[in-house]
């Protein structure tokens, strides 16, 4: 969610500092952040100090945990949108899938989870496979459903 309105490079360059500031991204710890911890994050010059995004990160972690509890895992939640299939798409930044997931997460109360951010997340975890067939990263035996 920190990427909203910023370049990916800006966020990725701060990844190690975010990881340290956010307790190695331990979801259980992030869920319990209080006003003292939020003030600490807001004063940390090594991360993005946007109050709305910091508050959203704590809020979103709580909703993420609820989804895990409801579905058994966040992966199982995502499978309700994909039927467990890997999707091959190139030259896109959003799709109906990312639109639908974004809308559902927003309905549940998450913030800064627009379709472009969700699409990038789905690419990062391998749900959307975006390597062109002549790319050195393209896998001959991939499990994409629409190549």
How does the language model describe each region?
Residues 1-147:
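HhH-family (HhH-GPD) DNA N-glycosylase catalytic core used in base-excision repair
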